[in-house]
């Protein structure tokens, strides 16, 4: 290129740089340049939407045509070629799986896990996938062989123990096949199954009756034999029939047969609701035991109880709260009480329950201090055959498929045998059969009492020998199996039932006893606690039994047991403490413990050796009623005529459990207590036609008559809905919350009036226009903005007083006339009761109530409550 050409091109570039229209144009290349996008408009958007809809419709039609084609043409029944292809495909898959399992045994375990129900396979597969993601094939294979495979074997054993031979026989009946998969069912499925079981029991009753009721001459024993046949069918389902112990056949019956219990028992066995409760409880327990078998209830998974059971308990608590909030209690006078307030004021409130127990334990401590007794803390654990999972989360090889309920029954039986051994043998007044005495005789075979020897005509050898010490005699009696408490050892205290991390029950006991009897009681209790499977302990009995003498210098017995009471109720004051067994907060564990106790029906707390606490509650209730009736009288005015009974009442009213025990007769058997709980038969029948027993009040053997503490009878009814409020919430702008927070202007105006009356000179923002409000808000400081936000959030709820339906005078006259036509008085009291949401009994178990401006009659309360 010449110098002139270069100068011309430079001039051209300068001109192009000066004027954009004079620059070179870009070459057109459709493969590299993006396509020009049309400008967006309403029409283009509409066209795009139509195109998308057409595309979706085309896809839907193609999918539908494929489904129709596969259903009517390419299926096994219509196309033999397709059937052969499907069979070949299944056979090839089975062969491939067999080859894989032959070369890789872990595939067999995975296939077995996948074949389990969802509540078993899903959590296990999550753990298997976690180990697979670690990238350690040997650890993954070892986990499958050493943990998952034993879990599946234990699961099969648990299922075999749950499905007994009689249970399988009942499942063979038509329609009852669902009994075999009871743990896998939902609530709706269990309800349907319970209806079928109730129908089967009805058919059994009809078959058992036959021509029995064709004549009027039917003997009660024949009716009982009919009941036996229905009860036998119920026992096949591992369900104990109602009143079974009182009605069953006994060889040596001391009391006459209560034939009046047969109708109520039959009504329950023929009721679908009764069967639903039994089957649902059985389903939950079986499902939980299956989860325990596969190690899903442990410190490594979910401590104490499965997460599914905790979730169910939360939902049950939520439904209970909704039920309490939607119902109220109404008495004969028309007075109403909110049911939620009543429940929170009772012992169902965890705080009240904890306070009452702490007061009782404090009373025991004061009694022990006065008597000079010592306090010992015991811990008793079940043998290893009751524990399903080890501390490391692996299956326990010594577990014998024992359930949580069986572990609780083991401890109850052990404790009953121990207490029986502590009772004095009647008729014995000597050394080993009565109170210890240093006056004894010596036999050639050992030591015995004179009275027993005379009764049995045993040869006595009266010798003047040196008598052994009391300690030597105690140790000899224990080793000889005499359970030396034949000497009448006395103790009292409280026991707490707690779960291990795998749900197995263990006990903590706070016991008070005489100092001289501590060693004998401890040795006797250790003997009963370790007598089963003794060989697995060796010389160390600590894993099964522990005892610790409470040192007053370190802490009182009440302070020692307070932790165990709190962490088994609501975890109050234990948020900062961590459980050594689970590694979680004790307050968080309280929810799991409550769900565990509710599911397995384990009694968490039990006092023994002291007067009953129900009479203590009734006395406190009586004292409160008397205080309201006395009014302005002096507080020291006696309530009961007998001074001894009034002293017990005063002690209970003051909340001093120690004084209450002293006034009741100290630590004596219940038959010697001065005040006891009185019961009566309920007047109104239950839904099954029988009459239950309810608490009446108190009674005393030293005076005649009973004192009623439940004179007022309350009925549980559903809260009536205010018609005006319900109509106001039906508009198009009805709020979704309970209180209407819109508009805020009225609320703010009312607040500004209140502030101005108090001398508040803040600016009224409701009278500003948009510009003034904008400037004012941007000029506010952070403190003023926080105050404004708090004022905007402040909405006073509308409090509604006792509800009463509003009707016109004409409607009231119609109501009175209709009441009189039905045989009622039509008085103002009856009208007011109906308008407040109450009801009036109309006979035959029915009740009449007023709703939607008319009288209605049904058995709603009888069926539901």
Curated annotation (Swiss-Prot):
The record's InterPro entries line, in alphabetical order, gives:
Replication_gene_A-like
Any keyword Hydrolase? yes
Tell me which UniProt keywords the record has, alphabetically: DNA replication, Endonuclease, Hydrolase, Nuclease, Transposable element
Task: Give the residue ranges for region: Disordered.
Answer: 749-783
* Top EC class, one word: hydrolase
Q: What is its EC number?
A: 3.1.-.-
Which molecular function term from Gene Ontology is one that the record holds? Answer: endonuclease activity
> Basic and acidic residues bias located where?
751-783
Nuclease in keyword set: yes
A single GO BP term for this record reads: DNA replication
Family per similarity comment:
Belongs to the phage GPA family.
Its job? Possible endonuclease which induces a single-strand cut and initiates DNA replication.
Indicate what this protein is called per its UniProt record.
Answer: Probable replication endonuclease from retron Ec67
